[in-house]
């Protein structure tokens, strides 16, 4: 079973003090960075109530005009928390400076635009969990290529989740209603868990393919070495034959 993210989906959609709720002590902002103390009863999109889905869509419509500013703060905080991310964005900006034909999807500015578009598409799939999960994991797997060259690792997703949880859940649009606050906590927890799952799954495939290639290369090298040694033996043997 895949290891669970620190941002557990057990950010309950039930009242924190309800009979089945998860007792949590949040920050004054209405959203805590603290980890869940429970691993069971994971929230899923299917477990969101109709009113919570409505709250997500309504609050997103109100939040969207300010989304660019919100996501910019999230990514800038992530740069501070993870120098690897800052380096990736910096390199992308340098490349983009010399390429005016197309948008470089690795830059900070384009990430902000794509994240806004991503939430538009994601919230449209709340009633189709398979498509919802596939969309998120696809984004996660696309980042696996950064693991080798840029040392991108799973802990970056965790940091992103912590920052996003605090920034989004503390936004006045989200804190207006209890349903919206619960729903966004659940959404972000699932989002980070699936992003990391897609990333780690693709990374395992890369490593498996790399390992297989190394084994095959090793076989070829062994065969070439054996062939070379046989040739040398023949040469040595021929040199020892008496002249007739």
Swiss-Prot record:
InterPro entries per the UniProt record, alphabetical: Globin, Globin-like_OT, Globin-like_sf, Globin/Proto, Mb-like_M
Tell me the protein's name: Globin-like protein 9
Q: Does the keyword Membrane apply?
A: no
Similarity section: Belongs to the globin family.
Q: Which UniProt keywords apply?
A: Heme, Iron, Metal-binding, Oxygen transport, Transport
- Gene name linked to the record: glb-9
- Tell me the lineage of the source organism: Eukaryota, Metazoa, Ecdysozoa, Nematoda, Chromadorea
Species: Caenorhabditis briggsae
Source domain of life is: Eukaryota
GO BP: oxygen transport; response to hypoxia
Which Pfam families does the UniProt record give?
A: Globin (PF00042)
**Segments traversing the membrane:** none
